[in-house]
Amino acid sequence: MDLALITGASSGIGFQLARQLGERGYDIVGVGASARINDLGDHISGVEVVPVQADLATAEGIEQLWAVIERLERPLDVACLNAGRSLGGAFLDTDLDEELQMLALNVTGQVRLAKHVVRHMADRQAGRILITTSCSALTPTPYESIYGPTRSFMLSFAEGLREEMKEYGVGVTALLPGATATDFHQTAGMGNTKFGSNDWKNDPALVAEQGLDALFAGEDHVIGGDQATRDDAALNRTLSDPVKATKFAQASRPTT
Ligand SMILES: NC(=O)c1ccc[n+]([C@@H]2O[C@H](COP(=O)([O-])OP(=O)(O)OC[C@H]3O[C@@H](n4cnc5c(N)ncnc54)[C@H](OP(=O)(O)O)[C@@H]3O)[C@@H](O)[C@H]2O)c1
């Protein structure tokens, strides 16, 4: 059996990545912040599931996770660096400590974990890394003004790392979901925005499937979502930043 690591596996896109990698025959190391990660094995059958509860916004949490991987004494074939969060609201009002926590999870923690994963896979000259970023990487993100840049960082990181890892036989793919029906926007305190309703958003199972298909096809990136999402991403590559910022604010600006 091959082994796959998925961060943010207790919910949403990460949960679907874990479930679908299990269906593809991978043993799973699934990571989440809260105790609900311990239920992951109830949803995946026929493979080994190792749940890890760790705070990936901290160096200690990353080292705790990596110690689990090392104790398994098995090669890691797939790593999905997926855990992330947002914080909605006007930058004037949002809490700085919460923003710094988000940067610690979405950027610093990802880089810390990637360092371990990349060295491990380069030693073996094999492996595949899927980095979940966002269509928000393609636009300014008013009312999520720190979140969007964290996704741009991860997209640029993924594309650069991909080039470096080619000579080691390690693949790197970026998954850019459009708005997806998960806990994400509620957790970000965005219930009072258009993004706050899950009614119109993409199915996380579809987004995960597209990510995994692109990963195994060796693509550099993939937009996650339906045709409208892919059309919107293509449009965003042509519009000016001020126009995109106004368009994004229509969905992210609090209505109350
Ligand atoms: N949903 C969207 O519209 C959307 C669009 C574009 C990109 N994305 C990206 O997709 C990724 C997954 O988001 P999602 O929509 O699936 O969100 P979600 O349903 O809220 O799931 C977030 C996952 O991350 C885990 N997590 C949160 N903070 C953590 C921490 N400090 N340490 C370890 N794990 C932590 C959560 O664990 P607990 O459940 O235990 O808290 C959960 O498993 C994110 O990187 C996000 O930027 C989402």
Language-model features: locations:
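Active-site helix of classical SDR
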Residues: 114, 150
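Substrate-binding pocket helix/loop in short-chain dehydrogenase/reductase
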Residues: 90-92, 98-103
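C-terminal helical subdomain
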Residues: 174, 190-231
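Conserved glycine-rich Rossmann-like NAD(P)H-binding loop of the short-chain dehydrogenase/reductase
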Residues: 24-40
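Conserved NAD(P)H cofactor-binding loop of Rossmann-fold oxidoreductase domains
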Residues: 82-87
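Residue(s) in the substrate-gating loop at a strand-loop-helix junction
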Residues: 134
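Conserved glycine-rich cofactor-binding loop
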Residues: 10-11
